[in-house]
Amino acid sequence: MTKKIILDCDPGNDDALGIIVACGHQNLSLKAITTGAGHLSYDRTFQNACITVAQIGNLNIPISKGAKNPLVRHRLIAKVLDLQSGLDPERNDLSSITPDSRNSVQLLHDTIINNPGITVVTTGPLTNLS
């Protein structure tokens, strides 16, 4: 039986691997990817999710931007990591990825409502779920 999941993450190299595994696992059906700021900025984590999806050619997964910052404290920035993506920001095929127009909170809500029994897998900060 296939398990429907949403991956809420802050993609660097580790979460990029998680996206690849979730897309390729025969028992998983990745319904959405929601991103947010973690050790990298929210723009960078979103870009990394798009790069990963473009690399594996699975362009039908909704991807959205989420929280820019933590709710309570200032974001701790890993400046050495934020200077560069760690992935390939110069990819020519990123234009084929259309970001979901909803923010991550709305995408989470809509996907959960439309997929009873879905599991939210979190690998980053939990701000989008707060």
What feature does the model see in each segment?
Residues 1-130:
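N-terminal acidic, glycine/proline-rich low-complexity segments
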